[in-house]
């Protein structure tokens, strides 16, 4: 590198040999553009400044430059730096020093091509010429093409840019750069969890190639930017240097990725049984990788080497965790589920957070009771889903057996070939004849005789049955909105006033179940039918009606199956592409559009709710939006996303009917949220498996891009709220509701809750993604951002409570469960435990909302409708009611523990501030109260409870086999004793190894609080649900004898029960004669010392929680 002194000597005739002259001579080598702007130039062509400004980089001949300077000498003073005789300030000296230090770095920077600056959410830009606004807008940082910044391969890009050249790392003569190694260590130490960074070549367990050159380059550039930014009153030339260095950092982020050493990978294949994906998470920067907030992977091998999680026996306790041998992501909870806290990992995380508050025996008992109730709840959920899977596979037989109208014998899956089949036709007739008439005919205008005449016409029968279901559902909603209208008998004056008798209401519910069974039967019959041109649209309308009915009944399993069929058919028919609309009449085209966007809304909402990836790729959807969107100036999805944030005349929304405005708002929210999902939550840029092996600085840059994406999406949400302001006025009671019918009021309230839920879920899911990229120690900026996110969750929850308490009837509140309950769970397990303490006003609000749910719950348990307890509608509401009961209990316990109140003290305080609700907290805190009645009834064991004993055995065997102080004979002896002591979970502490003793000491503060029945939620891990997909490929379905109705036995079992093992759970590898029972609540709470099992399942997995 040419020094300043040699430069001045090479031009002795131009100016005196002093530093100002040297500076001016160096400017003579600048390009014309930099000279014109009076900024630094490195002499390259093109130079970084011209690249940034997007202008042509030209250089004037040296002689002409010299002549120009000579001619201008008498007209103006020299433009060089301050002479030696003039004093300079400290800032000027610092600036000069840094310029000398980092200009050589800029000279070696390879400035790759940049794309035009545009927002990340506007899609992937095409390669183009550099623009002058690359640096500026925070979102513009993320405008690069995610699939590569240039067409040059990554390796060649960095060869050309000389990133491996020592000159780039040692380009300064200053002491600071000479001591760069120590500064580099300091920088890495502050960013990478205090895990000593080492060469990948030195660790045989890491299968990535060495990235020291990239790591050093990133650290040098980051340090340069930080020092330049720390200067006060810096001139524009410094800003130009900062922009150039940040551009290079982004270039590295966009183009470089950790390279896999496939030779190492082959060697490691024989050394481990773990998947290659698991091994690819191992890297030199961190021993922990969060797939989500709750799902944490630990590098046990490197943890051992760094003495992390080392037990007194000399081996890694973490390696014996049950959780370490299970997939982190299970099929029930998906990747971004809102109820992830009820998974195996989630429960461990929550128990860890509650641990500091579990200081008394009462607190421990409350927590164990809660975990027992949660386990029972999950068992019931799996039981219901199993019933649904059987119902849709064999709908006619299932219904008739349930009503004891068929022998309870195993029957192979029906062979649906023709409705003329004698057996199928007979079963259809048998169900039709049981439909309660003439009441159902008065509701649907269809008689049983008409159904018998249509039974051979599959398509017409399917459509007729679905329309009947729609009419019955509308009648049911009307009755339930004022359930006081259900009377024992009608008087003469009540014949036409909208009231119904108990018998009529019972007929309504029973008829809906019969019709649903018939609908499933004809769905199976028409599934593989060929429809002539023109009739396929009618079939799609039928599928949409079936989906509506399943949503109303919360048919989890059946809805997913029908939805997949409907989406596949719609895409095959080209509903999502404009090309398939050319030539249609506009009326037909609009019908197709409405069907597609309704299906799109269903599919996106379902996958978002469950945490799954959508099967609809937005990049392939280019059909026009429905008419309501076009009326507002949005032609298609892309145009809507581009213009939603632009100012517009909001008066155009004032005359839109409420029902239409609700549909517009729902689809608008779905489109905006889906865009965020595809650009961030599932984008390879942020979820690539290689991200775990990237330097912390690059991870932090990705986090900043996600935070910017959240802010942009929230701005779109705010725009939608302004457009739908009329609905908010209705929901919050700012408009006289007498002028609006009940249906519109309920629709407005439901939409506003949906809006708050979208805002809630956006933050929650984005935080899960951020957790994957976080490094330790967390910066103050990141901690501030995450706390802000969690506080915003609280604000959205408060708005939800206000909306619910403003609703007219309890039944309408019950229909909002899908939005409210998951939000409460996230709040209870995150915000109130991490960033803010719950106050009494929060408890009052939660109990007041619960009271509204409870009113309907008490009605369902009344003598009027107790005979309907096993119907679809009431069973599903009972499940929802149980969930909200558990959440309310959790929040009360959380408040008690944070405020250090006993149960008696809390009840007294609550009674003083809220006497009208004083009767509810004692019931919520008493697990034997009527609120938990449905959870404590007997059901046959699901995959959770059946696998629980196996988990206990495996966890204990792990500890024995890893204990180096036990010889093989001792192990055999202990194993024999252990197998004798395992009749139930209440005897898990009889034989404890030295290892588990040591583990228990670490958790001594919890006493016997480690209630590990939580593992049954995902234990093996979700065997019941994982086999659901196998139903379609097998020749038979599980026998109905394997299941017992929930209400068939009133007493909770107290001992072991020999239960036939359902084929659905065979993949667990459990003995089919395995029996296990949770026992009674008292046994579980009073006899179960599960401290050791907590350590076996989770150990120190949550020693470093997310925030």
UniProtKB/Swiss-Prot annotation:
DNA-binding region ranges: 31-57
Subunit relationships: Interacts (via the activation domain AD) with the mediator subunit GAL11A (via the KIX domain).
Practical applications: The identification of PDR1 inhibitors or loss-of-function mutations enhancing activities of antimycotics may be useful for the development of novel strategies to combat fungal infections caused by the multidrug-resistant C.glabrata strains.
Region of interest (Middle homology region (MHR)), residue spans: 542-616
UniProt motif 9aaTAD: location: 1091-1099
Alphabetized UniProt keyword annotations: DNA-binding, Metal-binding, Nucleus, Transcription, Transcription regulation, Virulence, Zinc
Keyword Zinc belongs to the record: yes
GO molecular function: DNA-binding transcription activator activity, RNA polymerase II-specific; DNA-binding transcription factor activity; sequence-specific DNA binding; zinc ion binding
Induction cue: Expression is up-regulated by fluconazole and during biofilm formation. Expression is also induced by oxidative stress caused by the antifungal drug, benomyl. Expression is regulated by the regulator of proteasome expression RPN4. Transcriptionally autoregulated through a pleiotropic drug response elements (PDRE) within its own promoter. Expression is also up-regulated by clorgyline, an inhibitor of azole transporters. Expression is negatively regulated by the J protein JJJ1.
Effect of residue 391 to L: Gain-of-function mutation leading to increased PDR1 activity and fluconazole resistance
Domain of life from the UniProt record: Eukaryota
Stretches the record annotates as Activation domain (AD): 968-1107
Region of interest: Disordered: 1-27, 66-89, 149-204, 999-1022
Gene: PDR1
Effect listed in the UniProt record for changing residue 346 to D: Gain-of-function mutation leading to increased PDR1 activity and fluconazole resistance
Outcome after substituting residue 243 to N: Gain-of-function mutation leading to increased PDR1 activity and fluconazole resistance
Effect in UniProt of substituting residue 1082 to G: Gain-of-function mutation leading to increased PDR1 activity and fluconazole resistance
Keyword Nucleus in record: yes
DNA-binding domain (DBD): annotated span: 1-296
One example of a Gene Ontology biological process annotation: positive regulation of cellular response to drug
Function recorded in the entry: Master transcriptional regulator of a pleiotropic drug resistance network that contributes to the azole resistance of clinical isolates and petite mutants. Regulates the efflux of rhodamine 6G. Regulates both constitutive and drug-induced expression of the pleiotropic ABC efflux transporter CDR1.
SMART domains given in the database record: GAL4 (SM00066)
Mutagenesis / variant outcome for changing residue 764 to I: Gain-of-function mutation leading to increased PDR1 activity and fluconazole resistance
Comment text on domains: PDR1 contains several specific functional domains including an N-terminal DNA-binding domain (DBD) containing the Zn(2)-C6 fungal-type zinc finger; an inhibitory domain (ID) that may be involved in the negative regulation of the activity of the protein; a middle homology region (MHR) that probably assists the C6 zinc cluster in DNA target discrimination; and a C-terminal activation domain (AD) that binds to the KIX domain of GAL11A for recruitment to target promoters.
Descriptive protein name: Transcription factor PDR1
Locations listed in the record: Nucleus
Biased composition regions of type Polar residues, renumbered to the chain: 1-11, 1010-1022
